[in-house]
Amino acid sequence: MAHITLNQYLQQVLEAIDSRDGSFCAEMMSFKHPHVANPRLQLSSPEEKCQQLLEPPYDEMVAAHLRCTFAVSNHDFVEAYKCQTVVVQSFLKAFQAHKEENWALPIMFAVTLDLRIFANNAEQHLQQKGKGKVGDMLEKAAEQLMSCFRVCASDNRAGIDDSKKWGMLFLINQLFKIYFKINKLHLCKPLIRAIDSSNLKDEYTMAQRVTYKYYVGRKAMFDSDFKPAEECLSFSFTHCHRSCQRNKRLILIYLLPVKMLLGHMPTHQLLKKYDLMQFADVTRAVSEGNLLLLNAALVKHETFFIRCGIFLILEKLKIITYRNLFKKVYHLLRTHQLPLAAFLVSLQMTKVEDVDIDEVQCILANLIYMGHIKGYISHQHQKLVVSKQNPFPPLSSIS
């Protein structure tokens, strides 16, 4: 395959199209396939030869693909992106003409995946040279993917087996990757609605569903919807294939903070297994109610947490740490009328600096408001009066 002639290559593409062999045709259009390294196929002007053997718009699609292999061989990623855009546009013309059939879905998966990758590469290349607007290439790629998505989503005539709707989730996952990269998470909302209302949502491949739930979970986390976030990320982690350790680790980076905010602390073994010991001190600090240790852990691993986009989420653990510390005070004093001074002493003992009784009241008021403590502050008596039943409700029970 790596040394076939242009004629042989075009003949194979033609046969795949004529026999409706979407999977083989997808390989012939994919940059994961070895044919792209064949110098005989890396051509700057293959149009004439393609027109001789292939019908429009396939001739245009294949010619653009071969021009793309030429651009990649010259490390011209901006040109490769432009060629791949033509590949997707030409494919879409053919795809729309396929009424009530979906054999070409594998081709769509291959060409749209490569489009996103080339847009990413082109973007990085331009940024290194200080050219172009940040996110511009990826946004344009997203527009092309949305055109494909609309064709899939609007296919209401075909029977379920021949429906183009089977392509929706793959495209949504590619769009999620772009929207997260360019920080436009609000654009995910209509796509999530489209899947929520789809009767195929539980029928897509498990790999696609794992990816989808991962991004939906991350979005819910950023929206502070921690219970739906836990649900989605837990689904992804549980159903992610056990051989995909790297992906499982990636899911855990977001699942761990969510679980911790809901009161579930990870074990040392889990952190060790997935090389996430950055969370070890954070976990210990929250469990012990140790603000000093928590701040030190956040500072120590700040670069890692910021790079993962979870630093601000982890900062929310401070209020949980206060709750756990104050719960210890409650257990020590064994009364439902707790002097505010006792909380002040507990903070001072954990080396929290510059704290006074007013700040203690402020922290307690926040904890009561958030439902972490059932009770009220008696300003007259300078006491926290807590409920006799379950004054510190489980974090997982708080909406």
Swiss-Prot record:
This is PCI domain-containing protein 2. One of its GO terms (cellular component) is transcription export complex 2. Residues 210-391 form the PCI domain. The gene is pcid2. GO terms for molecular function: double-stranded DNA binding; RNA binding. GO terms for biological process: poly(A)+ mRNA export from nucleus; post-transcriptional tethering of RNA polymerase II gene DNA at nuclear periphery; transcription elongation by RNA polymerase II. SMART domains: PAM (SM00753). The lineage of its organism: Eukaryota, Metazoa, Chordata, Craniata, Vertebrata. Disulfide bonds: none annotated. Transmembrane segments: none annotated. Belongs to the CSN12 family.
